[in-house]
Amino acid sequence: MKTSSLLLATTRETPADAVVISHQLMLRAGIIRPLAGGLYNWLPLGVRVLRKVEAIIRDEMNKAQAQELLMPVVQPMELWEESGRAEAYGPELLRFKDRHQREFALGPTHEEIITDLVRKEIRSYKQLPANFYQIQTKFRDEIRPRFGVMRSREFIMKDAYSFHMDKDSLQKTYEDMYDTYNRIFTRLGLDFRPVQADTGSIGGEGSHEFHVLADSGEDDIAFSSDSDYAANIELAEALAPRGERAAATEELTKVETPNKHSIEDVCDFLQLKKKKVAKTLVVKGATEEHPVVALVIRGDHDLNEIKAEKLDLVAEPFEMATDEEIQNAVGCKAGSIGPVNLSIPVIVDRTAAHMADFVCGANEDGFHFTGANWDRDATPTLVADIRNVVKGDPSPCGKGKIEIRRGIEVGHIFQLGNKYSEALNATVLNENSRAQILEMGCYGIGVTRVVAAAIEQNYDDKGIIWPEAIAPFQVCIVPMQMHKSPRVEEAVMTLYNELTAKGIEVLLDDRKERPGVMFNDMELIGIPHRIVIGERGLDKGEIEYKHRRDEKSQDIPEAEFMEFLLGKLSGN
């Protein structure tokens, strides 16, 4: 293609409302243009990238024997009511009525629709297992869409749904999809990690997320320095410290700490490090007998709410106790609470349970205890893992130390079990001709988010550096003064025609622009292989080549150039 035939909408200015680099570069490179909050037009360059991402996904899904179909974006609300998610999903589900006053929603996901289809079309166990997928537009009415297409309201997803007679069959397909996703993201050229994850609002029994590692990511990923172990920080297990707890050497002493309510205030006042202080938080309990519960973690650690709410004594969903509830249960403000002489259940983190001679609140405003020790001064109701892991913790797999990086979630796979099939009564006849509820799996990839994530991982101060597999064009040709030199024009067109005849995607910059403008645009839009042809090079019988990741260009003899370029395109 020639730039004269392409909507090349590059800009030099960085929009003020674009915070993350992918949003900035997608706007500057003419990949997208905003329409309304969280809604974007995809321009021709962007669509070329999208189609390449989709093609890789489609190829791998087809190889995995998944069947492509297409379901409506508009969904009848009665299916959401039947599944029980009509209210549970919340305001992100955009609802509306048609002219007949029937209620519909714009689909953020398609579990209900595919389950309804399967219960109508699949009758016998002989038709299973079956795995269906689509690449379709979704809509989620985000309250604050941000980061461009990273968190937009309208987006494109590949979502797949598998159906099974038993959990063993589901497990096999789940493992197949896990392997398929690894192949997809590898082919996309991304540095990613599959991580153990929480099932969230989708529900189900087992889950993995696939994260592209990038500093702009919204999720913290914990992974081992010496193995393949990786997990969302919400699920990564914090192991108990090894060895015996140190013996008590101090007496329990109450000290005055006037107006010192935060860990920082107490540590500054008492000249202590945070790891010497036990932080006590009061949360809502799960029973009438214990309406509030105390959680104790070390002062330098953060509470993990996901882990905490899975405990029997803690209310689900997780919620902090109110000031009034704390005052009624303990008799002081939140910043003065401690486990000593506490009349409510005390759940202690594994690491906090290893502390000796620690400082904690005295359950009296303006006072703390020093020299506190477990068993002697306070007895835990339960010791459990309730904190986030931190860098340097031993890896739960037993190999290496925990490292933590930011990640952008681009894929998620779930073992749903029978959550939706039971709610919608999706059954088939088993070998005994009896109706049996189906087991389900769910497998999603954010197609538009993949594009943004690829940029977050591949850019420099000049613009985008696309992974080869998803670049809008493989090669760009930048002629020097082509419109003034028939010789240059002939050489350029000859090479352009030869490359396109070989099926290579070439962008020829045939604009009447200064060379600097053309160079800047080609680097901004991130085409991997750049060719420059000019009078000076032709005089020497050479063609200039530069890869987008290289600092310097190379001059290649004309006679050798095609073989050289084909080698570069094949990765040699």
Curated annotation (Swiss-Prot):
Its main location: cytoplasm. The gene is proS. SUPFAM superfamilies: Class II aaRS ABD-related, Class II aaRS and biotin synthetases, YbaK/ProRS associated domain. This is Proline--tRNA ligase. GO terms for molecular function: aminoacyl-tRNA deacylase activity; ATP binding; proline-tRNA ligase activity. CDD domains: ProRS-INS (cd04334), ProRS_anticodon_short (cd00861), ProRS_core_prok (cd00779). Belongs to the class-II aminoacyl-tRNA synthetase family. ProS type 1 subfamily. The keyword Signal does not apply. Pfam families: HGTP_anticodon, tRNA-synt_2b, tRNA_edit. Gene3D superfamilies: Anticodon-binding domain, Bira Bifunctional Protein, Domain 2, YbaK/aminoacyl-tRNA synthetase-associated domain. Its EC number is 6.1.1.15. GO terms for biological process: prolyl-tRNA aminoacylation. The keyword Nucleotide-binding applies. Keywords: Aminoacyl-tRNA synthetase, ATP-binding, Cytoplasm, Ligase, Nucleotide-binding, Protein biosynthesis. Signal peptide: none annotated. Homodimer.
